[in-house]
């Protein structure tokens, strides 16, 4: 969601939305994840994803506390959980990484990327382990030597440890 879209929903101008996002970030309520772009024409360059450090705050703000099986935002909730827990455990163990996501103008996406040891380590998150993951070959072609892993309910524990 862009600042413009948030502004339209809330009735605030872009500058006010940016300032509020900044304040929420400074208060450790949310954080922004930048997009990866190394000059490929089809990559989105200045986009950011916004995550909540605590899914409970996210749920409170949108007023949804239904069981996971009854929710229509399971994918977003799962992604938010995995990204934040991975960043927390990396910080705890002093594993320094640069974090980002990747998206093209044609909406191909990698949910989460860590850049360390001179390589990109990409992760695609799926709540349903039986659902087919579309891992974009465009990413592998643009970033040879990168690793792409699918993270689901079956293997997430090793990801957040």
Protein language model features and the residues they cover:
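Terminal-proximal interaction/regulatory segments of ATP-powered molecular machines
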Residues: 121-127
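Structural motif
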Residues: 119-121, 147
């Amino acid at each position: 969601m862009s600042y413009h879209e948030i502004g339209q929903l809330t009735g605030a101008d872009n500058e006010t939305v940016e300032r509020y996002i900044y304040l929420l970030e400074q208060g450790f309520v949310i954080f922004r994840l930048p997009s990866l772009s190394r000059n490929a024409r089809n990559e989105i360059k200045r986009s950011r994803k916004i995550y909540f450090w605590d899914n409970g705050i996210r749920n409170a703000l949108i007023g949804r506390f239904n069981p996971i099986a009854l929710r229509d935002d399971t994918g977003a909730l799962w992604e938010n959980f995995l990204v934040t827990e991975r960043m927390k455990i990396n910080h705890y163990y002093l594993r320094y990484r640069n974090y980002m996501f990747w998206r093209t103008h044609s909406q191909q996406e990698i949910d989460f990327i860590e850049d360390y040891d001179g390589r990109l380590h990409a992760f695609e998150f799926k709540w349903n382990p039986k659902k087919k993951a579309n891992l974009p070959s465009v990413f592998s072609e643009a970033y040879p030597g990168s690793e792409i892993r699918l993270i689901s309910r079956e293997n997430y524990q090793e990801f957040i440890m």
